[in-house]
Each structure stands twice: as structure tokens, then as C-alpha cells.
């Protein structure tokens, strides 16, 4: 399942050897002050805190095993970065939201002490979210690899230029896509760029990915939901402008050439996100995307008026 709940042991008070990783946004005005408060809160309880500053441009490196958990302080972008850093080592992530949406950063700043206390007491279990494992090959050699919690996007590097690519799933060709780009999104990422391009929103518990074309030239190229147990292969075809970009969770990974191939499948590791329950997910859909039903109910009028 994409959002499996993991067993949780009481963390309790540390003897001083336990380490906590803080990943702190440098472009959120309140982040530094809040981070200092979190460090003080944890230090009193015997934890050693190590901090990584995230400026939106960092290239992630895998956090070493040994951290009991990580605290992300920023928005969804900071949480995405934290997931790519912490997930290979199985480190749970508590994400405090200082951004606008907070789909995967569910802890509001005014509740951070209660959230940490509940987690340390063992009252909250992290849920596993699926990650995409992606490799890029050129002439049979791997030139890049990545993990993505939201999505991987193949797109033209220029405005108003089409990308041509053949899309296959488990070696079954879906045909050639001529579009502004192609998105492969996880259930977590289905609420982001894919949704903006007309893709469906997937429940986090679904073992599936969604392939969504961006402004496809052929109207029959529609979003397709595929099981995450398979392998998606995208081959870059000849194009006039000679420039196709691969982005991961909103950050450019590399520039692709003709005949380059992208292979994507579900990663063997998952993002362990604390407080990202199904209830929180659906509440976020209603509140963050302003789902409020009838326009009459929003105005406080009866449906039969």
C-alpha cells in the first residue's frame, strides 16, 4: 500500500546519544526562530540536534542512518527535500508547515510542541508514502538517478516547444506523446502538477502511479493510472529544438538528448511521514483546494432556494 502505517515504539526521553535531524527552510521568515525553539525542546529531553539548511536549491544527500527522526520546518518543498534525504535510511519525518498548502507538512506551527510530545510518547505512527525510483540511461549507460516523492517531469526546456517521447509500461507501448511534457506522479504528487494538468487525484493508499501528458497535441493522449508494481519507460525521440529537461519534485535533474531513456518504478524504500493520515489527506483536499460543494451552500443558502 502507498500509505502503509508503520509500527511505532515509544521514543521516550533520550539518554543523550539519540540524534534528531532538523531540515530548515532559509526562505521562510519564521523558520530559524521556530527551529531554535525545537532544538531547545529536544535538547532538554536529551536529544542531539543536527541541522541542514534548505534554500530551495540544495542537492540532497542521503542522511546517515542513526537519526531517530527528522523534523522538517518549512513548506511542502522542504518536506519533499527532507523525504529524499531521509527516506533511504528509513528516518521518520515530522513536518511543520510554514508554507501555503501543507499537503505533506500537516503540523501547524502553533501545535508543534503537542505534535512532538505525542510522537515521543509513542502515540503516533508514521505512514509510508511511495517513492519513484528513476534512472536515466544514454547509450546503455546510466547518467543520472533520483528518488521522487511527488513526481518526475519530462518537458521542453523552451517555451512553446513540443517534446516527443515514446511511453511504455511493462514494455507495452502507449504510443508517441507529442506534448509540452509528461508527468509521472505518485499518489502523494497527484494533488500537485499532475492535478493542475487534468490528472486524477489518487488516494495515498493506492499502489499506483499516474501518467499525465501536459497539453498533448493529440486529444486522445489522456492521463493513465498504472500499478506501481510495473516499470514505466520513456524514450526521448527526435525533436527540432534538441532540448528536453527532466525535473524531480520541481527541481531540474538533467538535460536529456535524443534516444535517452528514463526508467521509473516504485522504490524499495518509502517516505515515512508522521501525521499524514488518510483523514488529514481528505481534510487537506477540502480545505486547501477549497472544495466546498454547492455554490449555494458556500453562501449559506438552502439548496432548494
Curated annotation (Swiss-Prot):
One short Pfam family name for this protein? NAD_kinase_C
User: Where is this gene product found?
Assistant: Cytoplasm
Database matches in InterPro entries: ATP-NAD_kinase_N, ATP-NAD_kinase_PpnK-typ_C, NAD/diacylglycerol_kinase_sf, NADK
Chief subcellular location equals cytoplasm
Residues at which NAD(+) binds: 76-77, 150-151, 161, 180
The record's keywords, sorted A to Z, are: ATP-binding, Cytoplasm, Kinase, NAD, NADP, Nucleotide-binding, Transferase
Instruction: Give GO BP annotations, semicolon-separated.
Output: NAD metabolic process; NADP biosynthetic process
What does the record give under GO molecular function? ATP binding; metal ion binding; NAD binding; NAD+ kinase activity
Tell me what reaction this enzyme catalyses: NAD(+) + ATP = ADP + NADP(+) + H(+)
Q: Which residues form the active site?
A: 76 (proton acceptor)
The answer on whether this UniProt entry bears the keyword Transferase reads yes
| Record-listed E.C. numbers | 2.7.1.23
GO CC terms of this entry: cytoplasm
Which cofactor is recorded for it? Answer: a divalent metal cation
What is the purpose of this protein?
A: Involved in the regulation of the intracellular balance of NAD and NADP, and is a key enzyme in the biosynthesis of NADP. Catalyzes specifically the phosphorylation on 2'-hydroxyl of the adenosine moiety of NAD to yield NADP.
Q: Which family does it belong to?
A: Belongs to the NAD kinase family.
In Swiss-Prot or TrEMBL terms, this protein is called NAD kinase
What taxonomic lineage is listed for the species of origin? Answer: Bacteria, Pseudomonadati, Spirochaetota, Spirochaetia, Spirochaetales
What's the encoding gene here?
nadK
